[in-house]
């Protein structure tokens, strides 16, 4: 992440939005004052000390690589007389037919050894020695042999943590360690006073409870670690284009081998070390490897390309010379540990809550222990005197201390920040199945609060399956149909005009025509390039003949800033010609001539220019993207390094490209509006095209504003403040305009903004936004690295699904906090009050440990994994600054706590009289009944917590098997504890009337919940709602 922050700062002047590590370190120290298990609380976030070491390693390696390159350049001057290391060919290499040692080949590229490369015959010689062809690549049948000799393209990874390491981490809990000591003391004293086996029951019960807590915790954490590992592997899946078996195909970087011919384009991350074959204007950013911020120009004179670097501009083909651990990038990556995730905002907030509650619990625990001890001493002093002590007295004090420590175990809600991780991990897994790869934990959480989505048009709102629908040429507009267009154009334009059109299409394109296994031709490239090239092929044009007839001298690839692509070609007659294709308004401004029907270049009059603009607007009003194609004859002595000219062009044609709106987008936009989320379309297209698509999607409303990027950029700060909230469409925009829009929405109005992007130049906006969403199909690797979420199917409806799950995460954690705080309050108060009044705690250490497991691990599993429902998208997003614990939650917490305290207090102080329980074991029966009723109150309150405002808490419960399984397991184990484990848990078996009473008292919590939800409270809104969002209704919702 540090490399990306530096890249954005140096190239786009965009500061990092994440907190510094020093701030994170101070925060952890602050919340670490009351921590049961610091290692577990901060498990899923980075080890800051290790991360610092990793950064030092990266800087050291970068410095070594940089110095090595300088030294190597100097050493070449003096290397003639030096004795060179000889690399021998092994029998396996010779048998396979290769003629170069793997280590020698790897060093040629990594050391930029031009002399060694020349000695081997240059790039051509290397390709012969590794049995590869620039045109046909390698044969797939050779993959195993090449991997055995030259290696696989994988880096050595540190082994995953075993299950027993998670068990060890769970045992680091300081309060569990203290309880273990208490249990051992209890066993020792018990054996001395009561003998075997009765004397060890109390201590053994605590030990078994600790074992159960540790094992459940370790299993939960281990499963989460496997899930994160799986998601991490998904993040590393990158696909690239190679030429194999004579055809271009897409493969995983892990399947790459030495000899492969790789196609590189803007935004790609170089997957392996290689040598440049040919290309156009290739600029490589090596800052991730060498630390140098200036891009490196790669050509046939300097053909070395290193793994881990990024293509900043241009395109090229390279031959792979080293993979995996034979690359410098592989060696660097293998030394680094897993980075971990920075704490999410919700984790930070809940860490603070857990610490505050922990301090309160510590005070209650100390007071409870002191009260119990003082009462014991008073009673002892009044009976036998303080001078006479027995071993049973020591056992009593040990049990008091164990109870106090257990109160801390229950009071410190260690499960709060961990529940966030569990809920996020569950959501990330589900989103992965729904075509959304969450790269950063915080993104899933933050997306639930998004109030604005700034989305691209092409491929996100539309299908990205483009076809040329209309064409204007020689002042004639034609609708395109595959069967008749060739004949229709021949009837209105001359063959020379048609030939010029086809030359412009075939030469000025980044798409390629490739042959599949069955011999059929397929066009590869961006959707726009494919559409135009397929149109040219539909005109019966001979792509291969045109490709062979002309030589490309210079290519300026399309990017979102220039909005055009230019190519300089050398014609067979010795002359040169520029072809330029791009945004209609930009290309038209560069033209002062046009091609007539006879193929002649004629001056472009103002009337003709106006008619052409009307044609462009007409195409755009039909929701067609428009592109112009033009050419310019140039002198033969032109400077190859000069940029393409910006004037003097002759207009050839205008293409109207159709890109239909994706099915379901209109409904998704409607869902956003009902959820209080504003959708703003930001596109580089013509404003009329953008408005037509926006209206079709339901984005542009009657009071919405559609504006062009240049006009938006020219606005003053005050004008922008008045305008920005009403902007729904921004056309002809640059990446900088998108970044400005995001910055102002966040800065001026405190909006939570999500942004989609696919190009390298979208990196600043993706990084600036609260949630960056990169396209998985059309997106470059640079865009993906800048993003928080990768939308694998490039579909807008998938983005809405991310928002839906984000809201589910936030609401689920609120449910869990409501449930846990209720348990905390009741457990603390009932034990403290009982200690003060009666002189004993009704809930023992073993019982409290079981309650803690219900509350922490099982409660988190049940409530933090609730799937989203449609109601979540009918309420406004949570605004920045709103309290996490709302008034609705406090109403439910206090109401349920008062009810439970009343019931348990009645049983404690009047249970024997009210229930007519008599006999020697009446006290044990009452305490067991209190414990059983307390647990069933939590079981039914867990059901209550499924809905914080709605009365119907059973909606969708059948479909949530995790919740049902947790409730069933809790009830089943409670029966086992009461009926069969009484010796260890200090309980006695209950009759059916007492069981019915316990379940009945617990179930009344459901009725209490209905009554509480009928009590109106304030909405709890703490911040302004600039978009006019409607606050949630008070009181109960519809059932």
UniProtKB/Swiss-Prot annotation:
Pfam families: CaATP_NAI, Cation_ATPase, Cation_ATPase_C, Cation_ATPase_N, E1-E2_ATPase. The keyword Translocase applies. It comes from the Eukaryota. Its EC number is 7.2.2.10. Mg(2+) binds at residues 758, 762. The chain crosses the membrane at residues 176-196, 199-219, 251-271, 353-373, 407-427, 825-845, 848-868, 892-912, 961-981, 995-1015. One of its GO terms (cellular component) is plasma membrane. SUPFAM superfamilies: Calcium ATPase, transduction domain A, Calcium ATPase, transmembrane domain M, HAD-like, Metal cation-transporting ATPase, ATP-binding domain N. It is an enzyme of class 7 (translocase). GO terms for molecular function: ATP binding; ATP hydrolysis activity; calmodulin binding; metal ion binding; P-type calcium transporter activity. It catalyses: Ca(2+)(in) + ATP + H2O = Ca(2+)(out) + ADP + phosphate + H(+). Residues 1-175, 220-250, 374-406, 846-847, 913-960, 1016-1039 are cytoplasmic. PROSITE patterns: ATPASE_E1_E2 (PS00154). Activated by calmodulin. The active site is at 456 (4-aspartylphosphate intermediate). The keyword Metal-binding applies. It is a multi-pass membrane protein. This magnesium-dependent enzyme catalyzes the hydrolysis of ATP coupled with the translocation of calcium from the cytosol out of the cell, into the endoplasmic reticulum, or into organelles. The N-terminus contains an autoinhibitory calmodulin-binding domain, which binds calmodulin in a calcium-dependent fashion. Belongs to the cation transport ATPase (P-type) (TC 3.A.3) family. Type IIB subfamily. This is Probable calcium-transporting ATPase 9, plasma membrane-type. It comes from Oryza sativa subsp. japonica (Rice). The lineage of its organism: Eukaryota, Viridiplantae, Streptophyta, Embryophyta, Tracheophyta. The gene is ACA9.
